[in-house]
Amino acid sequence: MIRVESIHKRFHDQEVLKGVSLNVEAGQVVCLIGPSGSGKSTLLRCINGLETHDEGAITVDGCAVHAKSKHIHELRMQVGMVFQRFNLFPHRTALENVCEGPLFVKKQARAQARENARHLLEKVGLGHKLDAYPSELSGGQQQRVAIARALAMEPKAILFDEPTSALDPELVGEVLNVMRQLAYDGMTMIVVTHEMSFAREVADRVCFLYDGTICEEGAAADLLERPQHPRTRDFLRRVLTSSDAPST
């Protein structure tokens, strides 16, 4: 489904990704963990075509991803993205935010777009907030609207860039519950997260990134409970509670 082969990405003199390779099969959930600045978000943006990689190759469902590709807009529609900061249109209701892409990018009929948006908002638990503006919604509700908006484009995969990092702690669970349901429904997902319990429960694989490389990857339980690389162990000690800390 998603193939990343030895990609490099530089910003001026700084190399942010240093030969990263990653394969994600259809229906899999892969969580990316690691310290800030390790290249996790940049990797997602390269997969989605929001950033151009300098070397290597990325394919989604057999189609090459590159900013210069004449098919880049079609490729971006196949890979949805949910950001840290919601990025909703403040002057549009929840329903209108979800309708935006289908109406203006996919050219759906308005009635169909609205019906689909209504269904998706109900799916994320916001059927009672169709006419609410972002300023009238909590952070967790706004992020659920953002997830519904991504789903409205009928993507083959969704990339999540720390979707709960901007939320108050009491709102994190409602967003993770929606993501769990997507995983159980078979959505292909790559998730940058610091929510280790979510990764342990939902992910098929976890990849630990450090300094632009994947230092270690493996089945979620194996990597989180029995990490092999010293940097992975050090990172997990810092982010996990003592009761969840991996053995040495």
Describe each model-derived feature in a short phrase.
Residues 210, 217, 221-248:
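C-terminal boundary and immediately downstream tail of ABC-type ATPase nucleotide-binding domains
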Residues 1-220:
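ABC family nucleotide-binding domain
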